[in-house]
Regions:
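Short glycine-rich anion-binding loops that position phosphate/pyrophosphate groups of nucleotides
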Residues: 10-13, 94-96, 170-172, 212-213
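Active-site nucleotide/adenylate-binding loops and adjacent lid/helix of ATP-dependent enzymes
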Residues: 2-8, 38, 82-85, 125-206
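Short hydrophobic-acidic sequence motifs that mark active-site Asp/Glu residues
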Residues: 89, 166, 216-218
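Conserved N-proximal alpha/beta basic substrate-recognition cap immediately N-terminal to
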Residues: 32-146
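Glycine-rich phosphate/pyrophosphate-binding loop regions near the starts of catalytic domains
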Residues: 208-217
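Short, solvent-exposed beta-strand-terminating loops
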Residues: 2-29
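Short acidic/His/Gly/Ser-rich catalytic and metal-binding motifs that mark active-site loops
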Residues: 14-19, 173-176, 216-217
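Glycine-rich, phosphate-binding/catalytic loops in enzymes
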Residues: 23-25, 105-108, 183
Length: 218
């Protein structure tokens, strides 16, 4: 009997951003990633999701191993997984909401007893939560750059770390929220960038030294 492989993915939406004053879309409950939401203002909200060509390429690579069943990782994923009953899930889904989003699909697979590729929910969640990941490194004695977590603009104003500093969203990946303005050489720049990131991404901001422990970055 051929192996049944579930391909879990997020398909990047293709739609223009709303014009100024446009009404805000509600979160989708229809099970389609094409239902965009604009209540989160970050310009790169769907940056981690994959283009159709990428998903097609992954499916082609998996076909020699068995039957491939596409399982888009949206609201009805649990129902689709139960119906498809794959032997294994090849997971490239990123999720959308919260610091645990990359662990949602593996957690559902575990709950339903379906083996899956890559890391488990705990590993994915810890890795995406940058301050927690750095705390784990510190606990285990692994060198990591000094850092602080800014939850408010006041935290940035009171930051005691020496400049220059690097500021980025604490729960993002794929370079989301990172730009030339992330490197802050003065407190004024840091406060401005932290204020922007807090209002845009609505999550804490990781502020870290640009020097590693005992190592100069070049």
């Amino acid at each position: 009997m051929a192996v049944r492989i579930g391909l879990a993915f997020n398909l990047r939406p293709e739609a223009p951003a709303p014009s100024a004053g446009a009404s805000i879309a509600s979160p989708s409950v229809s099970g389609s990633s094409r239902d965009l939401r604009y209540d989160l203002p970050q310009p790169d909200l769907y940056a981690e999701w994959d283009e159709p060509a990428t998903i097609d390429a992954v499916e082609r690579a998996l076909r020699p191993l068995g039957e491939v069943i596409r399982l888009e990782a949206v609201a009805d994923f649990p129902a689709k997984l139960a119906k498809a009953r794959p032997d294994f899930v090849f997971n490239i889904a990123e999720g959308l909401y919260g610091p645990n989003r990359e662990g949602h699909i593996p957690a559902i697979c575990e709950f339903m007893g379906v083996p899956y590729s890559a890391s488990d929910p705990l590993t994915l969640s810890l890795a995406l939560h940058k301050s927690r990941a750095k705390e784990m490194l510190q606990l285990r004695g692994v060198p990591t750059a000094p850092f602080m977590l800014a939850r408010t603009v006041a935290d940035a104003r009171n930051c005691a770390l020496p400049f220059p500093l690097f500021a980025k969203p604490a729960f993002e990946g794929s370079g989301k929220g990172v730009s030339v303005k992330s490197l802050c050489t003065t407190r004024k720049e840091l406060v401005k960038q932290v204020d922007y990131l807090l209002s845009t991404y609505r999550e804490p901001v990781l502020v870290s030294s640009t020097d590693g422990v005992g190592t100069k970055l070049k």
